[in-house]
Amino acid sequence: MNLRLLLLLSLLQWSFSCFSVQAITTPVVYYGKVLSGGKGIANVPVTDGTQIVLTDDKGRYSISSTSNAEYIYITLPDGYNIPMKGKVPAFFQKVPAQPSKKVHIDFELTPSSTDNKKHVLVVWADPQVYFDEEMPQVQQASKDVKELLATNYQGIPAYGIVCGDIIGDINTKPSYFAPMIDAIAETEIPFFYVIGNHDLDLNVRSNEHARITYKSYYGPTYYSFNRGDIHYVVLDDIFFIAKSYLYVGYLTEQQLQWLEQDLKQVTPGSTVVVAMHIPTYSREARRKAVSYTHLRAHETRRHL
């Protein structure tokens, strides 16, 4: 390779490196309001998934984001209904793929007519639907929940959460996400969702690409919301290691830093409920033998 060609390749490499760094670090300002009936709501946490800011007394917020944010979203405050879109809680808005330097995003909430201080939380986990013939069972379970709430908890607001593994095999049946949303909506209560290992895209090159399908239906994989005096936090503790179906339990540093900021907004002494797919405690940690399963969330759990 002659010196002239080597110099040209070096310059090209340098220019591409500079472009890549600029694409990551150039700030984008996301701004707007959190409103109810045209009036701003104060002290609502707004996040890009990395940093959290609070709305001012007029409901205004501004985030200078350098994190390649996918969403701008809020911590749903108590006293307002859960906004729904496509039968999924709509506390988030997806940002443009190539945002301008300033992006305007507003959120509109409606006041709740019920007191959430006493409420019901329905928890499901691992429905793992693989086949068409299993869907009627989910529909029946939803009807059972609806009947139970009407019989035993009439007049008490109710919410639900699915703690991961919504479908069985995303590689063969990613289309099951949509009918699962429809089936669960038959409970007629708002349901939140947690990502599980069965909900990951597996034929991808890295963990960063493993949530594309899931996010297209449910949005952010970690977030929080308030109902009554309880602060609910949903975390994503699945890390795909880009080999077959293998994964480990792991909370990213970005997510932990977000969680620290989130919890700073919670009144000390409040009840905090954390939902994630892989448990924070496992007897595997007591085993002396080192194995694949021993890799799961035994370190990051200590920081919760």
Walk through the language-model features, giving the residues of each.
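Short, acidic Ser/Thr/Gly-rich low-complexity loop/linker segments typical of extracellular
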Residues: 50-65
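Short, ordered, surface-exposed loop/turn motifs in non-cytosolic proteins
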Residues: 28-31, 36-50, 67-68
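Conserved small/polar residues in nucleotide/adenosyl-binding loops
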Residues: 293-300
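Short acidic, glycine-rich surface-loop motifs adjacent to enzyme active sites
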Residues: 266-284
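Beta-strand-rich domain onsets/edges
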Residues: 18-29
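N-terminal active-site segment of His-dependent metallophosphoesterases
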Residues: 29, 36, 85-174
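A short, solvent-exposed beta-strand micro-motif common in secreted/extracellular proteins
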Residues: 68-85
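Extended active-site neighborhood of metal-dependent phosphoesterases/phosphodiesterases
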Residues: 78-83, 91-94, 172-260, 264-268
